[in-house]
């Protein structure tokens, strides 16, 4: 693959991810969640979506794949640790952090299907 082709592929993947995150955010809003952050970036990693409903905080990884199995397999243990570290930074900035219940979810965006929301996709080691 040449430089132009690699750049084009990365750019296409980036915009596909942005569209998937917007679709997932819409889905969570339909479920009554407030979107607190989109693409929350830290030096430790990035969280695709942070959503709140009352004291429940969802830390959401969004994956656009052909199948649910591919989306689930795309989140490695290393990814989980990075997401956890970024979540710790976000939570430390919340005044009501002691009251919050945090859950790590996955939303899979699949072709021609409604988003697939997998609650508690992984658990924190803390």
UniProtKB/Swiss-Prot annotation:
Source organism of the structure: Bartonella henselae (strain ATCC 49882 / DSM 28221 / CCUG 30454 / Houston 1) (Rochalimaea henselae)
UniProt-recorded name of the protein: UPF0102 protein BH12350
Family indicated by similarity: Belongs to the UPF0102 family.
Single GO molecular function: nucleic acid binding
Matching PANTHER family: UPF0102 PROTEIN YRAN
NCBIfam families, per the entry: PRK12497.1-5
């Amino acid at each position: 693959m040449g430089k132009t082709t690699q750049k084009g592929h990365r750019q296409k993947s980036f915009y596909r991810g942005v569209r998937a995150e917007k679709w997932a955010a819409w889905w969570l809003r339909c479920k009554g969640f407030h979107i607190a952050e989109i693409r929350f970036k830290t030096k430790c990693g990035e969280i695709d979506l942070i959503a709140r409903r009352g004291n429940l905080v969802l830390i959401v990884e969004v994956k656009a794949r052909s199948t649910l199995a591919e989306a689930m397999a795309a989140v490695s243990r290393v990814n989980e640790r990075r997401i956890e570290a970024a979540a710790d930074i976000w939570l430390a900035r919340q005044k009501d952090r002691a009251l919050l219940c945090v859950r790590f979810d996955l939303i899979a965006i699949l072709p021609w299907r409604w988003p697939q929301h997998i609650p508690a996709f992984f658990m924190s080691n803390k």
